[in-house]
């Protein structure tokens, strides 16, 4: 078993583009006033993969599904997907990452790496 990283550091300009496409602060941080953990290098979006095949393991939803099926409740998904998501959560927490309750794929580590308040100006 291994990991596939979808997203880590994200420039503010990319955050602004995401916000423009999906302006919901529960799932996408505002590029100026939000927490912007990806812009600060304190967040990672990832999943589990089978190292032999390279295939992604079954998870509660696809990546960036912005609805309640993506949360960490897991009662509304396939039991295998729930078990895989719990494995990912357990491993990430073991290494100091905190899960975000609304997205099974999103983890932060703001304790080990203090947040840098300097940002590039948003584009557009």
Model feature map: region roles:
Residues 1-124:
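Cell-envelope/glycan interface and biosynthesis
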């Amino acid at each position: 078993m291994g990991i596939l990283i979808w997203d880590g550091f994200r420039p503010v300009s990319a955050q602004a583009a995401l916000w423009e496409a999906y302006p919901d602060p529960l799932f996408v941080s505002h590029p100026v006033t939000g927490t912007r953990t990806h812009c600060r290098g304190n967040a990672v979006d990832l999943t589990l993969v089978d190292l032999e095949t390279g295939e992604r393991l079954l998870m509660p939803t696809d990546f960036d599904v912005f609805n309640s099926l993506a949360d960490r409740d897991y009662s509304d998904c396939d039991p295998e997907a729930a078990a895989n998501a719990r494995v990912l959560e357990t491993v990430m927490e073991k290494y100091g990452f905190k899960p975000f309750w609304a997205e099974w794929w999103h983890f932060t580590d703001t304790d080990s790496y203090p947040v840098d308040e300097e940002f590039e100006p948003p584009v557009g």
